[in-house]
Each structure stands twice: as C-alpha cells, then as structure tokens.
Curated annotation (Swiss-Prot):
Keywords: DNA-binding, Homeobox, Nucleus
Primary location class: nucleus
Places the protein is found: Nucleus
Region spans: Disordered: 16-136
Function: Transcription factor maybe involved in reproductive processes. Modulates expression of target genes encoding proteins involved in processes relevant to spermatogenesis.
GO terms, molecular function: DNA-binding transcription factor activity, RNA polymerase II-specific; RNA polymerase II transcription regulatory region sequence-specific DNA binding
DNA-binding region coordinates: 134-193
Tissue and organ expression note: Expressed in testis, mainly expressed in germ cells, but also detected in somatic cells such as Sertoli cells, Leydig cells and peritubular cells.
Descriptive protein name: Rhox homeobox family member 2B
Gene behind the chain: RHOXF2B
SMART domains xrefs: HOX (SM00389)
Family membership noted in the UniProt record: Belongs to the paired-like homeobox family. PEPP subfamily.
Amino acid sequence: MEPPDQCSQYMTSLLSPAVDDEKELQDMNAMVLSLTEEVKEEEEDAQPEPEQGTAAGEKLKSAGAQGGEEKDGGGEEKDGGGAGVPGHLWEGNLEGTSGSDGNVEDSDQSEKEPGQQYSRPQGAVGGLEPGNAQQPNVHAFTPLQLQELECIFQREQFPSEFLRRRLARSMNVTELAVQIWFENRRAKWRRHQRALMARNMLPFMAVGQPVMVTAAEAITAPLFISGMRDDYFWDHSHSSSLCFPMPPFPPPSLPLPLMLLPPMPPAGQAEFGPFPFVIVPSFTFPNV
C-alpha cells in the first residue's frame, strides 16, 4: 500500500481542479454582477424614470445572480446559469426599449391628432361654396336715427370723417355703418335724379319729331294764331305742369279758299304787260 502522505497528495491533486473551477465561477459571477451594475447605472442615467420593462429586467438579473451563487450543480450547469444572466438582461432591455418606442409612437400620434383636427376645419372652410358664404351684417337703424341721418343728408351729402365719427358715437354704432348708409343714400339719390331727367326728356323727344308743312299751312298759321283768344293760351299754360312744356298748336282744320285768278288775255291785247290787273287776296278773318 502507498503511504498516507502520498494518498493525501493524490486526493488533493484530484480535488484541486474542482476548487479551481469554483474560484473561476465565483470570479465570473463577480464580473457579471459588476457588469450588470454598470449597465443599470447607464440605464438610470439615460432614463431617469424607469419603466416596467427595465423593472422586469432587474428582477430577472437579481434572480440569475442568486442562482449563480448557489453551488448545487456542476461546473457546466453553473456556466449555463452564469451565461443566462446577460441573456435575460438583454431581453429585459429589449422589452424596455420596445415599451419606450411604443410610448414614443403614442406621443407622436397624440401630437399628430391635433394637427389633423386643425386641418379638418381648414378643409371644411376651403370647401365652402361662394353662395354659402355669410353676408356681412348690416346695422339696422331705428326710425329716429334714420330721420336724423336724412336731415344731415339733405344738408350735406358727403359728410366728413369727423362728422361720421360723431354720428357713430351718438347713435352707438360703428363708423363703417354710417359710411355705408351715406353711400347707399347717395346711390339712391342718383337713381332718382336719372329717372326724373328721363321722364322730362320724353315730351321733348315727341315734339322734336320732323313734321311736313305745306306752303298754304305756313301762310295760314299766323292768321290762326291771331284769331285765337287769349283764354286758350291762359288755360293751357296753367293747366300744364311745370315739368312738361306747352303742347304744340293744333293744325288748321279747314284750309282757306285759294285765290281765283282770271284767265290770261292774249299777248297782243295786253297793255300793261302780261298781268294788266292787280291781284288782291281775299282773306276772311275769324270773328273774335
């Protein structure tokens, strides 16, 4: 048999690899813990408010660290447990980042929604037809205010800015309303004046038509004028209105008798030329 010293040395040589493996695993666990702490500090610096994903990752890291510290399994099992901690860590980080990305997308959608809400009214306003556009409101004056404005218009059709402002202040209306009323009143007055001028021009246009007058009517017209009574002119001048002129004289009803000339004598018997007699017109004057 071998001596006891050799047996003890052999046993220590057999057990030394296991002890070395345990030390290596402890060192590896310590390194993993230090790495997890550094990653945790970086995440806290990058995200001051930890989210649910990071909290779940921390729980998984602590559970993996506790499982690595236990010495129930062999070296390979411990290696697998130690290597699983970073895997859970990255899964937790991915979940946290996905959650944060989801929150960012939600915030972007919430930011876009007001823009869409504002853009819809703009489109609705742009789609309005010209016929549906609201007309500007016109102020309705009271009868007393209209009477006052009419009196001012009779005195001055173009009021100054100071007068318009004073009227607006006294009537408790805007200056624009007063200005619009005066513009409309001037337009109405111009239309009335044009209508009066057109009505007065109609008789002149009727009298101005050309009339054919014969020589007999031209000769007899002064006789009819002298034979008319003064009552005719008086009645017609007063019966007609001031806007219309005096009507024209009526044409003669019956023509005067033509002058009867005797037959011409022969040329040899004429003593005083071709007309040896005196022509005396015979006119009958009407009884006055």
